[in-house]
Amino acid sequence: MFISRTTANDQGPVMRQASDVTPTWLSAVLGQPVARVSVQPGTGNWSQQATLQVELHDGTLQTLRLKLCLGQTFGRSEVDYYTRDYVGLAGAPLVRCFAAHFESGVGYHLLLEDLSATHHDRRDVLPTRDYGFSVAQALAAMHRHHWQTQPAPNEATLNRYLDEVRPGIAAFEAATGRAVQSRYAVHEQAFRQRWADARGMSLLHGDLNPTNVLTPKAADHPVYFLDRQPFEWSLTYGLAVYDLAYAMAPWWPEPIFRDHAQAILRHWYDSLNRPDYSWDQAQDDWRLSVAQCLDVPLEWCSKEDTLTKMRWLWEAQWTRIEAAIGSP
């Protein structure tokens, strides 16, 4: 089970640094007078993060997380994730959002509830079947909420996405000595053909890596999903089962994936409960989506700095995904 915690105000302009946060601004956002706030800088892969220790005038203490994504590469997808896309979904697996604002060409900020005292991400926790069921059930609810509500992505959208991946092919081949160009061409053709058909599509999270999933420190559920994929080139609508494939194939140890993937896929399918979408089609889409996960290490390889700096990650991802492709 999971608990809805979504509320948000569109509070602009976009914060440029954590020190811009003031008691006056927080008072307006929280709807309660704030006496003082202390800011503790944090880290993020593509963002600036900070923990805010907030003291209200009545002495109540509250901990919040500020996230700043600044620059022209960021779209408004993550702001919509908190302020629009799942507001009407009971039980949406999102942490509470108090404020969010996006400006084109500038970026966005988010002010989120901080659950670090009671919850942790899944980076250092071995996945289990029960955890997989929790993720699958939460994703099914989100996918059902926007099931087949849009046309399939157009060719320009797919091209923009693939243009981010393709430069990584030659770099991957040079770094590893493995030829993948012809294999990728076959996959791209299958990908384009299937993604031209809107069956089985929904809004996507796009980046359910283990650091973007929170659970209680002593349990595998409920789950909360953070940090929707924020880039302008990201695919925000497409084959729904890709979210589940990406949450597992690049990250799960191979024996655990092999033993539990089909049961978790079936739990997602049963929880989705869409009679217009057959189990056979879901399995076909799963296989294509697991193969699509190879785009992740290729995208790492597409940029010179991450080709080297993130080799420890993308090589491990490639190995796991290859094993997942070969799993029954």
Predicted regions and their residues:
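Active-site activation/catalytic loop segments of kinase-like enzymes and analogous catalytic loops
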Residues: 80, 237-274, 290-312
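Conserved structural core of kinase catalytic domains
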Residues: 99-134
